[in-house]
Curated annotation (Swiss-Prot):
Pfam families given in the database record: Chi-conotoxin (PF16981)
Coiled coil: none
Post-translational modification: Contains 2 disulfide bonds that can be either 'C1-C3, C2-C4' or 'C1-C4, C2-C3', since these disulfide connectivities have been observed for conotoxins with cysteine framework V (for examples, see AC P0DQQ7 and AC P81755).
Main location: secreted
Expression sites by tissue: Expressed by the venom duct.
Lineage: Eukaryota, Metazoa, Spiralia, Lophotrochozoa, Mollusca
Keywords: Cleavage on pair of basic residues, Disulfide bond, Secreted, Signal, Toxin
Name this polypeptide is given: Conotoxin Tx-D0111
Cellular-component GO terms for this entry: extracellular region
Entry's localization field: Secreted
Note on domains (UniProt): The cysteine framework is V (CC-CC).
Family matches, as InterPro entries: T-conotoxin (IPR031565)
Length: 63
């Protein structure tokens, strides 16, 4: 029974220590634009261009 208070105190000390597994986020760590958003933007840009022939650049019309 004498070990029980020591065990409880150790558990409380372990629980109160800061965790190193989760890094703090800073402004520099924020994720950039997602790949999905970039792909969607590229597809929208390509869908706005209408070309009659791929080798005739003068025929291309950007709407």
């Amino acid at each position: 029974m004498r070990c029980l208070p020591v065990f409880v105190i150790l558990l409380l000390l372990i629980a109160s220590t800061p965790s190193d597994t989760v890094p703090l986020k800073t402004k520099d760590d924020m994720p950039q634009a997602s790949f999905h958003g970039n792909a969607r933007r590229t597809l929208q840009m390509l869908s706005k261009k209408q070309c009659c022939w791929y080798f005739d650049i003068s025929c291309c019309i950007t709407v």
